[in-house]
Curated annotation (Swiss-Prot):
Coiled coil: 2-63
Pfam family, one: ICAT
GO biological processes: response to ionizing radiation
Family: Belongs to the CTNNBIP1 family.
The protein's assembly and partners: Does not interact with CTNNB1.
Tissues in which the protein is found: Ubiquitously expressed, with highest levels in kidney. Up-regulated in several cases of gastric cancers.
Protein name in the entry: Protein LZIC
Amino acid sequence: MASRGKTETSKLKQNLEEQLDRLMQQLQDLEECREELDTDEYEETKKETLEQLSEFNDSLKKIMSGNMTLVDELSGMQLAIQAAISQAFKTPEVIRLFAKKQPGQLRTRLAEMDRDLMVGKLERDLYTQQKVEILTALRKLGEKLTADDEAFLSANAGAILSQFEKVSTDLGSGDKILALASFEVEKTKK
């Protein structure tokens, strides 16, 4: 009996996830090696990676316009790409966990950050930035936040994350989110 494209859809989804993982790992590696690179080399590599994300975004757009069975499964990837392109999230690891819809790992990362802050291994500014990113990602994944987390998010969410949150909520449909991501890519290129 024919699989009616289920095997192919599964393989395509796996390939897309691997491509997104590779690009997010590339961004994360770039941030980790930032001190070792000169400014021009860093900027050029980051620009190339964002261009690759843009091309990946265009591919997703084409796939979604022709295959509606993938729409729900790809929407998380689209939001992650949109966040990376608009640079709302600065932490590639958070983007990757968000794209893979892994709230448990996001919460584990949050606990590790709390511990690192207490022992002085993580600076307050970086902690605040990453905690806001993780809490925003958890909220977008439909996770319930504690009152303390909501208060922290309200007090510390910047304009960029607020804009990402508003846009992703208002748009809803994959096509509109992809259109916004494409717009952000074009804006970044200029």
